[in-house]
Amino acid sequence: QRSEILLMALTGNQGKSGGGLRVAAWWELDGQRALWGGGSGPAWMTATEKLGLLYKAKIGGGLSWREFENLAVKSKEYRGGIPLMSFLYAHGGYKEIWDSPAFHDPALPRPTAAYMKEAVDKGWIPVRPLPGIDPKVYYFTGMNPLRRWPAPQIAQKHLWPKLAMIASVNTKLSTSSLMGDIVLPAAGWYERDLIKYTEAYIPYVVLNGKVVEPLGESKSEWEISGLLAKKIQERARARGVTTVRDAAMKGEVDLPPAYDKWTRDGKYRETDPRAALDEILLNSKLTGNKGYDEAAKTGVLPVVHAEGGPAPLWALGTRYRQGRTVFPHERFVLEKEAWPTYSGRQQFLIDHPWFEEAGEALPVHKEPPKAGGDHPLLLTGGHTRWSIHAIWRDSSLMLRLQRGEPVAYVSVKDARERNVADGDRIRVFSDVGEFEVMAKVGFSVRPGQVIVYHAWEPYQFKGWKGQQEPVAAPFKPLHMAGDYGQIHYRGIYSGPGHHPRAQRVNFARAGSV
């Protein structure tokens, strides 16, 4: 991405319609701040800091991008959220594969463990729970970690036994739900009222209207969270529990009034989300302060006004008005606002010690590391065209449009060398794991490549060993660097991630050695 952005800068394709690199950005519904009555600032701020924040918001024209980033970086010390990779490294047992130097960039002069220790010691990357304290409860909504995480067998071996409770909120029995303890069935599409998504690829906020009642015992996530808050309050009062330490171990959470706070002292009810949705929309300048009933008439609200200032999910930096296309970074390029970088400009030289010792102070091409072992083929993927995501990947109707089961696309040359014909079952393997799948020999597949499209559930494979089993996907240690302008971690920004592309594998006919 650094190289792509450099190319755009060199060709003058930043800050104008049709230009710029945008991976993901969301319209900020400013009314969400009013939902819980956020007050004058986060609880961890001093009175002086809260006063300064209030002045900036009301009189000083708002925070600059750099001021916002500085505040967001500081807030990570007080929040429970952390990057997934540091959690799996510390608590999931992934050290056993990610510490292997053979799986990483050979230019790195130090092992992953050394980078992790320095990043944690310097406060660049948080680890929650703190090292030495095992996680006890894993509660996830809509997620499917045993399908998405690299080498999920590692998590099942090391993380799952530590957990006293695994609870899933889901619309279907995903692999992860089936491998958990409790499934709270969630209402499906058109069985609940909600704001569906606010991604800034289109100039609209999209809603989802309830037209039928939820099936069986399923409930909306709104109702589920409200009922959990009610039960937590009930049990805390019955047991005489007052406060508990928060996830960051920096503050306390008051449990006896949990439900009262959730409902804003009765303002909202878990059985009716419309009051909350109405408050969000009525307080959102973004969509013209129109309420939910008006929005529900068409199912969408046009975006009418966006200043493009800093916000947790906002990554465009462009003032939007109706009739314009949506594109990023106008405020930095045309209005000359300082970029939130070390230099205040578009910056491609990163003279951070970690980047320098890895030979990446400037954008540079490197071949994919031999993650998974020294094998001759690269496992890649793509976005499935048949099911959109895992939610419909096991639909009998969708499966009729293809082979009816998971398939791996392999080249004619690689198949011939391994005595594999179209439709044969093959074993795709690395040093980390393996899975069995049907081979689909394709003339358009490049030799040296194995393609498995995403979203297959592990339970659709033999022995529940899915396509992620041989994927080591070690994170890049440089992504834990901090204390250098734009190079830092905070919620929904930067941090180490797994990239399960170009992973080293081989394949053979199933049953062969």
PLM features per residue range, with description:
Residues 221-289, 390, 395-409, 413-513:
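Long, contiguous, secondary-structure-rich segments that constitute the structural scaffold
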Residues 1, 128, 145, 149, ...:
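Hydrophobic alpha-helical scaffolding
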Residues 8-18, 187, 191, 229-236:
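Structural signal for hydrophobic packing residues in well-ordered secondary-structure cores
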Residues 1, 152, 158, 162, ...:
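Accessory structured domains or lobes within enzymes
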Residues 5-178, 297, 302-418:
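Extended redox/cofactor-interaction regions of prokaryotic respiratory oxidoreductases
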Residues 175-207:
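Flexible glycine/proline-rich, aromatic-decorated loop/lid segments
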Residues 25, 141-142, 169-171, 186-188, ...:
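Active-site proximal loops enriched in glycine and acidic residues that flank catalytic Cys/His/Asp
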